[in-house]
Curated annotation (Swiss-Prot):
<comment type="subunit">
    <text>Forms a cylinder of 14 subunits composed of two heptameric rings stacked back-to-back. Interacts with the co-chaperonin GroES.</text>
</comment>
<feature type="compositionally biased region" description="Gly residues">
    <location>
        <begin position="536"/>
        <end position="546"/>
    </location>
</feature>
<keyword id="KW-0067">ATP-binding</keyword>
<dbReference type="InterPro" id="IPR027410">
    <property type="entry name" value="TCP-1-like_intermed_sf"/>
</dbReference>
<dbReference type="GO" id="GO:0005737">
    <property type="term" value="C:cytoplasm"/>
</dbReference>
<feature type="binding site">
    <location>
        <position position="415"/>
    </location>
    <ligand>
        <name>ATP</name>
    </ligand>
</feature>
<keyword id="KW-0143">Chaperone</keyword>
<keyword id="KW-0963">Cytoplasm</keyword>
<dbReference type="InterPro" id="IPR001844">
    <property type="entry name" value="Cpn60/GroEL"/>
</dbReference>
<dbReference type="GO" id="GO:0140662">
    <property type="term" value="F:ATP-dependent protein folding chaperone"/>
</dbReference>
<protein>
    <recommendedName>
        <fullName>Chaperonin GroEL</fullName>
        <ecNumber>5.6.1.7</ecNumber>
    </recommendedName>
</protein>
<feature type="region of interest" description="Disordered">
    <location>
        <begin position="527"/>
        <end position="546"/>
    </location>
</feature>
<dbReference type="InterPro" id="IPR027413">
    <property type="entry name" value="GROEL-like_equatorial_sf"/>
</dbReference>
<feature type="binding site">
    <location>
        <position position="51"/>
    </location>
    <ligand>
        <name>ATP</name>
    </ligand>
</feature>
<feature type="binding site">
    <location>
        <position position="495"/>
    </location>
    <ligand>
        <name>ATP</name>
    </ligand>
</feature>
<dbReference type="Pfam" id="PF00118">
    <property type="entry name" value="Cpn60_TCP1"/>
</dbReference>
<dbReference type="GO" id="GO:0042026">
    <property type="term" value="P:protein refolding"/>
</dbReference>
């Protein structure tokens, strides 16, 4: 086991806080509409330019191990806030730094860190309750666009495209962000259900321009095993052929003789068919096949339920208005499923979302809900260079998370004003001891810090602006983008309540841990001996005859 170095009391805290300051000072330069960019070196490829707090935080690793403890703890604040609320990472970092710096002064002056923490917790609870009172629900498309614009560093085009996407697929719908091919942002909306499986043979294509197999008013056969023997399929194929309608086959796989027969019939125009593999794997595949069956009004033909392929009838097949099968995706538009059955299925999946323990499972379940309930919107981010693409894509993703948070818990006035207005609720508090009162006082000062940082980044005098805003009421605040004092909600300067709340709670949590730490232990780096010099070249090779 490697030797350790241990530091106690102020010696440990001072070194750790040095690390907190290095990370926080790098991150906080990005805050506000006039925040600056940070350039991140990459071991491979071009450097990344970003104005995203969590991207900056994730890149910072300090050489001094005690300083690195501080940096990693604040990095954790940024990451947690990003995971929970999707935005507010810079605000959380600024708050954590302010609480730690103020708190250390009290600890050095002999205040009890545990009581300080209790005071901090009381003040944070009061501030959170006040934020909930200030919060107003987001209802209009314009408000969604405003929240998205603020989170995307005042880029109105990003706010608008997110609002359009939410209009089209609903607030529950899935919105994904992908690299675009042009210079402008584009929005693609897939109505109905899309899954990531394409045709099993290019011979199924009947629309060469779009390179898709388009089926109008088709039947849908859903089978949970492989199909290789055409005899199993013949009875159902004959029934479909008599109805003169196309057929989509979704199965674990269609291969050999069965696939060849389908292709030949398709080319000859005897029966218009297309075959695709079932989406997903294992239990998720079963669930997705069931979703498709409910959406199209069919059933999953499965031996587990005592059904067989050769006895399948038209009543057991699903139906849809139109299905398009591309090389990689299949889209089912306007399935013939019963709306009550679809609603019941969505309700059932929502229960599973609440019980899901992993983020991955939750995300996949939410995708299933969206596919059943609304559709999928894809925002394609356009940019001139790869560096710009990465930076812009990160901003779009941030803005998307922020708008979701706003829809969830509502919005408050942005620009650091909501936290400043929470001061009154904190000022009315009284702790059980003088040390707890010091913790409350500490938060009173810390909640000013986001506004101070926004103003400093805009090149103005922070104390003057803070006093002017404190003399106003309600949503009156400083708009750093225009340099004016105004009603921020009317101007569209909004922050999601969830983002502001999460930033404060996470910052206070980690800062309290640092203040109550009395020792720090790190591993001593081994001084490895220098490598011996390389031996000289091999002698005696001169006389060799080639």
């Amino acid at each position: 086991m490697a030797a350790k170095q241990v530091l106690f009391g102020d010696d440990a805290r001072v070194r750790i806080v040095r690390g907190v300051n290095v990370l926080a000072n790098a991150v906080k330069t990005t805050l506000g509409p006039k925040g600056r960019n940070v350039v991140l070196e990459r071991s491979f490829g071009a450097p990344t330019v970003t104005k995203d707090g969590v991207s900056v935080a994730k890149e910072i690793e300090l050489k001094d191990k005690f300083e690195n403890i501080g940096a990693q703890l604040v990095k954790d604040v940024a990451s947690k806030t990003s995971d929970n609320a999707g935005d507010g990472t810079t605000t959380a970092t600024v708050l954590a730094q302010a609480i730690v710096q103020e708190g250390l002064k009290y600890v050095a002056a002999g205040f009890n860190p545990i009581d300080l923490k209790r005071g901090i917790d009381k003040a944070v609870s009061a501030a959170v309750a006040e934020l909930a009172k200030q919060s107003k629900p987001v209802t209009t498309s314009k408000e969604i666009a405003q929240v998205g614009s603020i989170s995307a560093n005042s880029d109105e085009s990003i706010g608008k495209i997110i609002a359009d996407a939410m209009d089209k697929v609903g607030k529950e719908g899935v919105i994904t962000v992908e690299d675009g091919k042009s210079l402008d942002n584009e929005l693609d909306v897939v109505e109905g259900m899309q899954f990531d499986r394409g045709y099993l043979s290019p011979y199924f294509i009947n629309n060469p321009d779009k390179q898709v197999a388009a089926l109008d008013d088709p039947y849908v056969l859903i089978f949970d095993k492989k199909i290789s023997n055409i005899r199993d399929l013949l009875p159902v194929l004959e029934q479909v052929a008599k109805s003169s309608r196309p057929l989509l086959i979704i199965a674990e796989d269609v291969e050999g003789e069965a696939l060849a027969t389908l292709v030949v019939n398709n080319i000859r125009g005897i029966l218009k068919t297309t075959a695709v593999k079932a989406p997903g794997f294992g239990d998720r595949r079963k669930a997705m096949l069931e979703d498709i069956a409910i959406l199209t009004g069919g059933v999953v033909i499965s031996e587990e339920t005592g059904m067989s392929l050769e006895k399948a009838t038209l009543q057991e097949l699903g139906q849809a208005k139109r299905i398009e099968v591309g090389k990689e995706n299949t889209t089912i538009i306007d399935g013939a499923g019963d709306s009550k059955s679809i609603e019941a299925r969505v309700k059932q999946i929502r229960v599973q979302i609440e019980e899901a323990t992993s983020d991955y499972d939750r995300e996949k379940l939410q995708e299933r809900v969206a596919k059943l309930a609304g559709g999928v919107a894809v925002i394609r981010v356009g940019a001139a260079t790869e560096v710009e693409m990465k930076e812009k894509k990160a901003r779009v993703e941030d803005a998307l998370h922020a708008t979701r948070a706003a829809v969830e818990e509502g919005v408050v006035a942005g620009g650091g004003v909501a936290l400043l207005r929470a001061k009154q609720a904190i000022a009315d508090l009284k702790g059980d001891t003088a040390d707890q009162n010091a913790g409350i006082k500490l938060i009173l000062r810390a909640v000013e810090e986001p506004l101070r940082t926004i103003v400093t980044n805009a090149g103005e005098e922070a104390s003057v602006v803070v006093n002017n805003v404190l003399n106003g009421k309600g949503n009156y605040g400083y708009n750093a983008a225009t340099g004016e004092y105004t009603d921020l909600v009317e101007q569209g300067v909004l922050d999601p309540t969830k983002v502001t709340r999460t930033a404060l709670q996470n910052a206070a949590s980690v800062a309290s841990l640092l203040l109550t730490a009395e020792a720090a232990v790190v591993e001593l780096s081994e001084d490895k001996p220098a490598a011996p010099p390389m031996p000289g070249g091999m002698g005696g090779m001169g006389g060799m005859d080639f």
